[in-house]
Each structure stands twice: as C-alpha cells, then as structure tokens.
Amino acid sequence: MSMVRAKVLAAICGAVLSLASVPGLSAAPITIAVADFDYVDTSGEARDQTAEHKLRVAKFAELVRENLSAQGDTSVLAFECPRHPCTPISMGSDDFLAAARRTGARFIVYGGIHKMSTLVQNGLVEVLDLPGEKLLLRRTVSFRGDNDEAYRRAAAFVSDTVRDAMKGR
C-alpha cells in the first residue's frame, strides 16, 4: 500500500472513531413514555367546563409527547392502558407502574393539573426512572389562563423541564 493511501486510510479511521465520542451520535435515544395527566377543578365557576378541560388536558399530554419527540435524542413510546386517563390516580399505583414498564421505556413522565381559580392553574410533573424506581424530577408549575394557548405554553415549559432533567442520562 502506498504511503498516501495509508495516510488517507488512517485519517478516515480516525474520523470515524472520533464520531463515537460526539454526544448524541453514539448513544441510543432516551426512551420516555408520557402518561395522561390528572385534572381537578376546584375553582367553583358556575359554568360546567368538564368537556373543555378534558380535551385540553389530553392535548397537553399530546403536546408534551410531541415536544419531546422533536428531540433527536429522545424516543417517546406509547403508553397503553385499558381505559383513559392512564394515571396513577385513575389506575392505582401498582397497575400504573406495570403499564409503564410494559412500554419498554426507561423513564415515565406523569402528573396532574389543578385549576385553583378562574385564571390560575397549578401542575405537578414527575419523571420516574423505571428500572431504578428512582424519582428524577418532581416539579410544580403554575400557569395563568384557561385556554388552548395557556395549555400550549405550559406544555412547552414542561417539555423543556423534562428535557433538562434528562440531560446526561
């Protein structure tokens, strides 16, 4: 083999090997399942908004899934359960954990939203490392508004918060 050919081959091998150390290129995607979110309304408003809130909370979870999926280093897996919502409260913790494990995901994202007043809502988001049964994130969030835009902004914030908790995992 000629000296030039040997140098080219060595350079190619070095470049390929250096790619293995670039974050995001060598690691498998993080697997996450996002459960449904619970919802409680204690605002005392006269108008029944149950149907609207049910749709918004479902869309909230969908947006969190979409936002996390948009990252190339994250794979969001389906969370299946016999009936919705798929939450620790509606299913019971043992059934919820069993369903979470069936997803094959390493992490499960879950939580709930509480409408406290006409404009103020509080949420709780948790991320559990399923194999280690270790809580990695427990974050309260507060947001103003009871419309699609308020939920969209809250879902974006929650997605960013979860993504930050996953860094280096």
Predicted regions mapped to residue ranges:
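A short acidic, glycine-rich active-site loop
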Residues: E52-K59
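Bacterial N-terminal signal peptides
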Residues: A10-G24
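Acidic/histidine-rich, surface-exposed loop or edge segments in extracytoplasmic proteins
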Residues: A35-A51, F79
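N-terminal secretory signal peptides that target proteins for export/translocation
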Residues: M1-R5
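Short, well-ordered secondary-structure micro-motifs
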Residues: G44-A46, I89, Q121
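C-terminal/domain-edge helix-coil "capping" segments
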Residues: A27-T42, E62, N67-T74, L97-R102, ...
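General helical structural elements
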Residues: L9-A11, F60, F157
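Short, solvent-exposed, polar/charged sequence segments at loop or secondary-structure edges
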Residues: S69-Y110
